[in-house]
């Protein structure tokens, strides 16, 4: 994965299940596949990396309005299996955050799978960002990749953006008044 897959972890129905199965089978056979175990462990850590990064601004998230952009594990699907969004949302809610989420396909599936999850859903990205203290990008939907960077400053209280999918080119981000932290790349702070 390494440099090829600089993101906040993997999800879906196959790779997480397959790595866990391979790890189980190797343990059962008395063979320790350290790289497989390390992959599983690092993926678990990567899934909440954005929250860890945001703690420089918010030691806890009590009273913080959080925009979650993208709920699914990848674009083009409503599949939420092993998607990082749910784990992050749980942490944020447990710490007292107010969460509003947007996803073009995943909202209805999210509501069905997690009916007791106390978050709000936005009709569009603008609505999700309105008055948000921080934004976490969890899925690299085309609508996000093409979303105008100026709108983060326009709609958010302070444009603090943590991108788990590296949706934007850093050279483009640098042209806007924004704090932008992504995975495996330098921080852009033009505030």
Map each language-model feature to its residues.
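Structural/interface elements that position substrates and couple domains in central-metabolism enzymes
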Residues: 3-191
């Amino acid at each position: 994965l390494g440099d090829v897959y600089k993101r906040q972890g993997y999800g879906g129905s196959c790779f997480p299940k397959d790595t866990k199965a391979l790890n189980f089978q190797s343990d059962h056979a008395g063979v320790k596949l350290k790289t497989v175990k390390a992959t599983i462990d690092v993926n678990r850590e990567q899934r909440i990396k954005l929250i860890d990064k945001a703690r420089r601004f918010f030691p806890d998230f009590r009273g913080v309005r959080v925009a979650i952009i993208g709920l699914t594990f990848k674009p083009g699907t409503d599949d939420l299996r092993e998607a990082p969004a749910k784990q992050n949302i749980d942490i944020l809610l447990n710490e007292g955050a107010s969460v509003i989420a947007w996803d073009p396909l995943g909202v209805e599936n999210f509501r069905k799978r997690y009916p007791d999850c106390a978050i709000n859903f936005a009709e569009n990205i603008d609505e999700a960002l309105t008055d948000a203290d921080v934004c976490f990008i969890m899925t690299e939907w085309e609508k996000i990749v093409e979303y105008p960077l100026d709108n983060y400053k326009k709609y958010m209280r302070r444009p603090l953006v943590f991108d788990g999918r590296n949706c934007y080119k850093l050279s483009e981000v640098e042209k806007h008044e924004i704090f932008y932290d992504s995975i495996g790349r330098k921080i852009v702070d033009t505030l």
